Amino acid sequence: MMTQPHIPSVMSDLRQDIVQMPKVIKECSGIRIYGRRIRSILFTTDVSIIANHDADAILAVYPFTPIPAIIKSIMIVASVPVLAGVGGGLTTGVRSANMSLLSESEGAYAVVVNGPTTVETIKEINK
């Protein structure tokens, strides 16, 4: 029987109150994006939470028209991959495509579109 190796842990008084994912999440297979295994995804746009968590990725979608400043702010504080919302509901076409380009240039791992996204918008994003 193999014993679990001891893994040293470093914390400080200033960063001890972080949003922690359930330990059982480490038992799932997860998904691999660009060679990085992601088991836990934190769904938030709150930059204070994005800066203080132990999730493997951030899902940053919100019910408003995507704004470059919000995506930039999230990307600045995120220390893990970000999956960025770029519209698809009311925000479509060239605007969604431009937000996708901005998200990619800021370092987002992927973009996320809403359910009612049209095929034309997907094609525009894919260009």
For each predicted feature, which ranges?
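Alpha/beta enzyme core
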Residues: 2-84, 88-127
